[in-house]
């Protein structure tokens, strides 16, 4: 068989861009992602710390993100935080499509001063979260640090990825959380890359994800 006999994947003809609009009685969330972006981010969720973390995903994952959200902030940030995770997860899944040709797996170890966090993920089609953060304070600014886990639970379930988060070191809550989002971004960037050697085939011995 000649090299030319293999199907060629023309990346320019396969834009990996998706938009999802989710409206509930509690929130109104619009997310657009471009998996082959340059790290451009527009985030206005009404939760400043979450916006800051979304910028980390975009910048370090080289994923263009536009996240606009309105929610019942007068109650607390929980519903908006969770629904942003849900909608972003759905947008990622939609942009990935059948996941043909992607590397699929990603792993990254991110330091931020004294904090060190490892993230490993698999766009497997099987949602699972193993969460190993020990965040010492209840809040970073006005952000409830319990919501970090809730964000990733929502993201994992709706993108159908397997995600492992391990904290190896860290005493500053902001540093621990930001290192987590940076590690996630770099691991995701690795996993969503198109592998030209796969020539558009699904990265599974089963032939389906």
From Swiss-Prot:
Pathway: Amino-acid biosynthesis; L-histidine biosynthesis; L-histidine from 5-phospho-alpha-D-ribose 1-diphosphate: step 6/9
Keyword Lyase: yes
Compartment(s): Cytoplasm
Sample GO molecular function, one term: imidazoleglycerol-phosphate dehydratase activity
Pfam families: IGPD (PF00475)
Chief localisation class: cytoplasm
Catalysed transformations (reactions): D-erythro-1-(imidazol-4-yl)glycerol 3-phosphate = 3-(imidazol-4-yl)-2-oxopropyl phosphate + H2O
GO cellular component entries: cytoplasm
Any single GO BP term: L-histidine biosynthetic process
Enzyme class of the recorded protein, top EC level: lyase
Domain of life (superkingdom): Bacteria
UniProt-listed CDD domains: IGPD
InterPro entries the record matches: IGPD_sf, ImidazoleglycerolP_deHydtase, ImidazoleglycerP_deHydtase_CS, Ribosomal_Su5_D2-typ_SF
Enzyme Commission number(s) of this protein: 4.2.1.19
Keywords, comma-separated and alphabetical: Amino-acid biosynthesis, Cytoplasm, Histidine biosynthesis, Lyase
NCBIfam families found in the cross-reference section: PRK00951.1-1 (NF002106), PRK00951.1-3 (NF002108), PRK00951.2-1 (NF002111), PRK00951.2-4 (NF002114)
Annotated family: Belongs to the imidazoleglycerol-phosphate dehydratase family.
HAMAP family tied to this protein: HisB
Protein name stated in the entry: Imidazoleglycerol-phosphate dehydratase
């Amino acid at each position: 068989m000649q090299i030319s006999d293999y199907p060629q994947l023309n990346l320019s003809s396969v834009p990996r861009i998706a938009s999802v609009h989710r409206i509930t009685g509690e929130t109104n969330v619009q997310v657009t992602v471009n998996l082959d972006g340059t790290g451009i981010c527009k985030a206005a969720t009404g939760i400043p710390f979450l916006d800051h973390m979304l910028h980390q995903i975009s910048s370090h994952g080289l994923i263009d993100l536009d996240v606009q959200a309105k929610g019942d902030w007068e109650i607390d940030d929980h519903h908006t935080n969770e629904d942003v995770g849900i909608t972003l997860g759905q947008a990622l899944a939609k942009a990935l499509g059948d996941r043909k040709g992607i590397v699929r797996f990603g792993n990254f170890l991110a330091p931020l001063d004294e904090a060190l966090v490892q993230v490993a993920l698999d766009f497997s089609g099987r949602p699972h979260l193993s969460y190993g953060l020990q965040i010492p304070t209840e809040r970073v600014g006005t952000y409830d640090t319990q919501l970090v886990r809730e964000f990733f639970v929502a993201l994992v379930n709706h993108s159908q990825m397997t995600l492992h988060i391990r904290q190896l070191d860290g005493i500053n809550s902001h540093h621990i959380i930001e290192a987590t989002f940076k590690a996630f971004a770099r691991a995701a960037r690795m996993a969503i890359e198109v592998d030209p050697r796969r020539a558009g085939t699904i990265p599974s011995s089963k032939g389906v994800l």
